Swiss-Prot record:
GO biological process entries: translation
Gene: rplD
Cystine pairings recorded for this chain: none
Stretch list, region Disordered: 46-77
InterPro entries: Ribosomal_uL4, Ribosomal_uL4-like, Ribosomal_uL4_dom_sf
Subunit composition and interactions: Part of the 50S ribosomal subunit.
Name of the protein: Large ribosomal subunit protein uL4
Source taxonomy: Bacteria, Pseudomonadati, Pseudomonadota, Betaproteobacteria, Burkholderiales
Amino acid sequence: MQLELLNEQGQAASKVDVPETVFDRQYNEDLIHQIVVAYQANARQGTRAQKDREQVKHSTKKPFKQKGTGNARAGMTSSPLWRGGGRIFPNLPEENFSQKINKKMYRAGMASILSQLAREGRLAVVDSLKLDTPKTKVLADKFKAMNLQSVMVIADEVDENLYLASRNLKNVFVTEPRYADPVSLVHYKKVLVTKGAIDKLKEMFA
């Protein structure tokens, strides 16, 4: 299988051979959905918290007498039935949101995403993305010349210049193959892979 090799103007300069085991796999929507949801679930910090009727700060005094008022009987204002009362089943910080995805499924799902991106024309190969200076404007101008507004770059090695130049650009994410994730691959409109990263992707997801 071959993919377009883009020049610095974003035009197809030539073709480059890529492994079919990574870039020409069958589209599996269910598997992609599963690994994306699992990745997002495993990234949750679990910091949400609510209080039950024992934790809310309320007086334990009976709000009104048991009989004679016409109201439903009430023991204290911390009851979940009252405004400001505790929750019946509160969310707790120790909740476990993690989902297990085995390595075989994850590799197959990532290869399916990369293959679908290639079929849609959203994935292309560049020779390299080296910068002589860590200037954001230099990288921004490079992407502007290639007509890229939302791009994920998978480079074989992210040096300091490339990292510093890209970290302040909106809708730009530069990473190495080992840190590529399904959510980012699905999110960005264009994915650029350097030639040196192709073998690493094959090693990881074939």
